[in-house]
Amino acid sequence: MNQTRVFLIFAWLMVAALLWMEWGKDKAAANAPTPIASQAVPAARDPDAAAPAANVPSAQAIPQAGSPAAVPGTSTTTATATPVAAGAAPAITLTSDVLRLKLDGRSVLDAELLQFPQTKDGTEPVKLLTEDAAHPYNATSGWASERSPVPGVGGFRAEQPGTTFELAKGQNTLVVPFVWNGPNGVSIRRIFTLQRGSYAISIKDEVINKSDAAWNGYVFRKLSRVPTILSRGMTNPDSFSFNGATWYSPQEGYERRAFKDYMDDGGLNRQITGGWVALLQHHFFTAWIPQKDQASLYVLAQDGPRDVAELRGPAFTVAPGQSASTEARLWVGPKLVSLLAKEDVKGLDRVVDYSRFSIMAIIGQGLFWVLSHLHSFLHNWGWAIIGLVLLLRLALYPLSAAQYKSGAKMRRFQPRLAQLKERYGDDRQKYQQATMELFKKEKINPMGGCLPLLIQMPIFFALYWVLVESVELRQAPWLGWIQDLTARDPYFILPVLNIAIMWATQKLTPTPGMDPMQAKMMQFMPLVFGVMMAFMPAGLVLYWVVNGGLGLLIQWWMIRQHGEKPSKIIQANAK
């Protein structure tokens, strides 16, 4: 099978996949399920003050700290809703070198990523968590109980005076303690810790019982969001990157649920020890990461228009004069592979969603590993992309050679195949039998060009998603006119080069026996794909240009290696 057919098959598959995604979005919009009924979104500032949504386990099903609980059922009993505390404390702002958080001690209401501007030339940072009225997105850690007092919305108060706390120059850690003082001597001390250069926020709670009775309750950690409506389009990576909830357990591995069909498979009610739960979008995500040795009930639910991903538990019984503690990390930030690795959380690297399938994700991770090492040497993501394509082409050269060798052998026997077709006329059975005998006699494998293609396809599909999903490439320049690899080429130079390379490759490709109508259609393919790619991210088009250019050189070399003349092929295709 020749190089152009390899390219065109891959391109057709890409277009088919993109069209399928578009159709899926339209179908989902037309047949969107009515959200599961639950309590209305409360008017209070903290959106999670309401009781949990219906069809979730009872408080008794929450795993107890330090003891394995049975996997819960689906009782609809819920814990008592937590009221807004009288005289709620004002919101507090915490600022590190990478994060600016607005919180009330219970919920992170607003989060800005200070090192990620919304636009290439802008100064406004990406806002991941937000109090936006239309599309609120919050992270909450609270306590619930059916019998004992717990903090209400706004119940936590900063121990230190002031409403603004900032990581000072020369400091590596910002520690801000909060406290809730309940009735009868029960208190909960909460400590927020931010580290320089990190998007992981440590939240540690200590329940101190100085009352005369046992205190019972469980901690819950929740991500709640009204998903934004993304502008649809095949050239907009935001619209076909995965947007939804993901979670990980040591037993089941990585799983996910898209916002558009959030409750199609019902709510998630599963007890997991360790693991994590996250809400993903293109380039960024939020996640709750509990302690590895503590069990939680993982829940997916809907609360009115909000999609909720929640961890419930562990539950604690704190005797008089005793205390108990629990800790978790809240990630609010980009999908930076280097920083995710520092968290040392199993499976967290899967939030860089190269694929929902493990084998494709492994291929993508391997390709990014090579790409990042090339970047550490070249210090430019554009040149790193070019270097990666060069390495892939070198590694896959034996397969390309096998493809062309198989195709060249088939072309040499085209006259004999034509004779067989003329001899047997419309008797297809005899024609096929004679053809197979010829293949067997001459040791021709008609599928010889397909096997190398099947091996190459997963690699190039994975590379496509690596370039789409890697936040490291976001707003990264290459050279000259390409100042953002995730934006389209402003002068369409790369798309024009891509059209020229595809046209030249097509002219250099032998097409014996091709139907005249098919041949005419093929002549328009470079223009069709060139126009389609004109509005795609420049990094992707750069990949296509380099890959196509190398393919053209390999095609020329293969033709000469097998005793064929490029000029004759070009003349034959011009007829």
Curated annotation (Swiss-Prot):
Q: GO molecular function terms here?
A: membrane insertase activity
Gene Ontology biological-process entries? protein insertion into membrane; protein transport
Main localization of the protein described in the UniProt heading: membrane
| Recorded topology in the membrane | Multi-pass membrane protein
For this UniProt entry, what's an example GO CC term? plasma membrane
Q: Domain of life of the organism in this record? A: Bacteria
Cite the entry's keywords alphabetically: Cell inner membrane, Cell membrane, Chaperone, Membrane, Protein transport, Transmembrane, Transmembrane helix, Transport
Under CDD domains, the record lists:
5TM_YidC_Alb3, EcYidC-like_peri
Membrane-spanning parts: 6-26, 357-377, 381-401, 448-468, 490-510, 526-546
Q: Pfam families under this entry? A: 60KD_IMP (PF02096), YidC_periplas (PF14849)
Has the keyword RNA-binding been applied to this entry? no
Subcellular location per UniProt equals: Cell inner membrane
Gene3D superfamilies named in the record: 2.70.98.90
Which cysteines bridge via disulfide bonds? Answer: none
Described purpose of this protein according to its UniProt entry: Required for the insertion and/or proper folding and/or complex formation of integral membrane proteins into the membrane. Involved in integration of membrane proteins that insert both dependently and independently of the Sec translocase complex, as well as at least some lipoproteins. Aids folding of multispanning membrane proteins.
Give the record's family classification. Belongs to the OXA1/ALB3/YidC family. Type 1 subfamily.
List the NCBIfam families.
PRK01318.1-3 (NF002352), yidC_nterm (TIGR03593), yidC_oxa1_cterm (TIGR03592)
- Record's subunit section: Interacts with the Sec translocase complex via SecD. Specifically interacts with transmembrane segments of nascent integral membrane proteins during membrane integration.
- Know the name of this protein? Membrane protein insertase YidC
